Amino acid sequence: MIQPPIGKKVLVEVPSTTANLGPGFDCLGAALSLTNFFTIKRIDGDSERFELIMESTEGNHLRGGPENLFYRAAQRVWKAAEVEPFALEARVKLAVPPARGLGSSATAIVAGLVGANALINDPLSKEKLLELAIDIEGHPDNVVPSLLGGLCFTAKAASQRWRVVKCDWDDSIKAVVAIPSLRLSTSEARRVMPKTVPLGDAVMNLGSLTLLLNGLRTGRQDLITDGMHDRLHEPYRWKLIKGGAQVCEAAINAGAFGCAISGAGPSILALCKEDKGRNISQAMVKAWESEGVASRAPLLNLQTKGSTWYSNQSK
């Protein structure tokens, strides 16, 4: 397959994601209406040249070079499509802050895969991109909804194949995501978790997940409230998030159906009806402020379309 001409570029939009939603550890994730934008261009130079230009204050510590996560994803596309690697430039506008539990690394992986594939005229199927994304990230709960959009349940079947189920999400349900100035790496959040859990905790999580999925499908508040309880990861992770329990309590008192750590944290997800969103947002920000932590708490929708790309001529 022939390399694209120097100067060819595409714009890739990739949504943020919230993973786990309480009981769905490492298998449930949803795309949200907070989006990163990547303008990707083939440039002249050595095949390992990767120029990263940040057009926002978020992520200004990130660097280019061949070890960059975005560029590593692009290289996986070229290898699968049997294309010789080429130099790239990526201009990035980040709305999804790194190390906050909103799938920032997943947006980089998905943008690298989708953008590199688009530059060489989309030879790889979405199914192949999905396989590559999970392999790079190591778990599916962020990259799958980031690529496909919506609420996604992903599991490795007994056949060792990844199976993805798009789940229904009632339009009346909105998400308030409180994003603190704190940072928390996924590796740190995983280190505090035990290698085994009591059988009763595992059974409780199965029940909670079933209630949550049915509540999200029907919009029933009682099912969401009872379903957003977890015993596999949250009991061990709350201690890493300063003021997290108080923020969650404030959201519930302001009218949220339920609360959960977003991904590995430290951001906190609250599900609610739209008319409660503003009060919940203010309550969560105030609760963190009382702990000396600055934050913001946007009211977000489910993003259903997933990642999309546009040619330079069309956008």
From Swiss-Prot:
One of its GO terms (molecular function) is ATP binding. It holds the Pfam family GHMP_kinases_C. GO terms for biological process: threonine biosynthetic process. Its EC number is 2.7.1.39. One of its GO terms (cellular component) is cytoplasm. Gene3D superfamilies: 3.30.230.10, GHMP kinase, C-terminal domain. Its main location: cytoplasm. It catalyses: L-homoserine + ATP = O-phospho-L-homoserine + ADP + H(+). Pathway: Amino-acid biosynthesis; L-threonine biosynthesis; L-threonine from L-aspartate: step 4/5. The gene is thrB. Keywords: Amino-acid biosynthesis, ATP-binding, Cytoplasm, Kinase, Nucleotide-binding, Threonine biosynthesis, Transferase. Belongs to the GHMP kinase family. Homoserine kinase subfamily. It is found in: Cytoplasm. InterPro entries: GHMP_kinase_C_dom (IPR013750), GHMP_kinase_C_sf (IPR036554), GHMP_kinase_N_dom (IPR006204), GHMP_knse_ATP-bd_CS (IPR006203), Homoserine_kinase (IPR000870), Ribosomal_Su5_D2-typ_SF (IPR020568), Ribsml_uS5_D2-typ_fold_subgr (IPR014721). ATP binds at P97, P98, A99, R100, G101, L102, G103, S104, S105, A106, T107. This is Homoserine kinase. Catalyzes the ATP-dependent phosphorylation of L-homoserine to L-homoserine phosphate.
